[in-house]
Amino acid sequence: PDSEDQRLINGLERRGADGDFQVKEMDTVLNRRPSIERLYGSVRQYADGKKGIVYAISISHARNIAGYYNQYGLNTVAIDSKTPANERKRLVENFRQGKIQVLVNVDIFSEGFDCPDVEFIQLARPTLSLPKYLQQVGRGLRKTEGKESCMIIDNVGLYRLFGLPTAHRDWLAMFEGRLSGKGYPSTNTRPVAYMAVSQGTDKDKTAETDGQLETIVSHGQLLDYLQSGKSL
């Protein structure tokens, strides 16, 4: 809660036509080298060597993240609305085949993208939209042979607004506007939390690891929750 990036996010005042944070203001505040360095540090600390997707604010932000990650040894590409369709298809296929380690995108993979062996999701784009949050983390929850977990690296504090993806929510109250789409974050969570999604059938587990909150739930349980809104 006291991280530099979280203080910057807490100061965002402008809203877009959809009621979410204004992209221009987010980009001005967070598309800077110190913030990108912290994004890189989180990947190296928690997901080093893993295959993942990063959600960026803007085309410039995505390209700057990819450039920095490549500079420091992570094979990374950025994909956005300006990427030609054939090139996008080629890059995604290379990612699926393991030729690319990290894909940075701008609202391309929020929905309709399937790459089951994604090992981590990094949230680098603040949002006030619960559906967008759940769509983003959902990209890493596909089950595949040999996949033990998917890590959620939340650098922008979305868990503080919405809770972990597994949090119980009063959907009726949200639809009625009484909760404004807010979740129920745990008081024990940290600014950069991560969640491993097990494919096993063990009951939910939580543990503190290196000062970070780790939540492990069965793969089927979490997918069922995201699809139906049922409590885990």
Describe each PLM feature range.
Residues 53, 61-111:
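Conserved helicase ATPase core of P-loop NTP-dependent helicases/translocases
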Residues 1-58, 170, 176-177:
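Conserved interdomain linker/interface between the two RecA-like ATPase lobes of SF2 helicase motors
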Residues 72-75, 116-120, 146-151:
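Short glycine-/polar-rich loops that comprise or flank the Walker A/P-loop
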Residues 25-27, 31, 35-38, 44, ...:
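Long, largely alpha-helical accessory region at the distal end of helicase-like NTP-driven motors
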Residues 3-8, 59-60, 83-85, 109-111, ...:
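Conserved nucleotide-binding/hydrolysis micro-motifs of P-loop NTPases
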Residues 126-135, 139-170:
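Conserved segment of the helicase C-terminal RecA-like domain
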Residues 68, 91-94, 117, 132-139, ...:
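Alpha-helical scaffold elements adjacent to nucleotide-binding pockets in ATP/GTP-utilizing enzyme cores
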Residues 103-121, 137-142:
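SF2 helicase motor core recognition
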